[in-house]
Amino acid sequence: MKYQQLENLESGWKWKYLVKKHREGELITRYIEASAAQEAVDVLLSLENEPVLVNNWIDKHMNPELVNRMKQTIRARRKRHFNAEHQHTRKKSIDLEFIVWQRLAGLAQRRGKTLSETIVQLIEDAENKEKYANKMSSLKQDLQALLGKE
């Protein structure tokens, strides 16, 4: 496993996930009967700061259809949590218009690079072009100054 599992932290994430799903109207319990489901949800709501009890609640009461989705959500959250610890692994997002993304993705594919690597390469190319243009302009001015003196 690449990322360490932190039981207390992840139990909090699981609790938040289940409460969010409940508030969105999803069935988070395995019970069909509304009163049994509400009773289980009420117990869950009282367990916010009880990580071990949250895991026990999940084992006893959670809707089996949510198991894989919750695992995926927690796995993604764990990855983001650990990546955020280091500047070089921290991720940022940008909004691109579809046509821009499409062109960037095509360029990245042709170059065999990731989108991030392609963006860095494009920035470096633009910086090099700018340096070259400045150097040429400076050489042109120096040459004109030399020719103008004679």
UniProtKB/Swiss-Prot annotation:
Keywords: Cell cycle, Cell division, Cytoplasm, DNA-binding. GO terms for cellular component: cytoplasm. InterPro entries: Arc_rbn_hlx_hlx, MatP, MatP_C, MatP_N, MatP_N_sf. One of its GO terms (molecular function) is sequence-specific DNA binding. It is found in: Cytoplasm. One of its GO terms (biological process) is cell division. NCBIfam families: PRK05097.1. Belongs to the MatP family. Homodimer. This is Macrodomain Ter protein. It comes from Escherichia coli (strain SMS-3-5 / SECEC). The gene is matP.
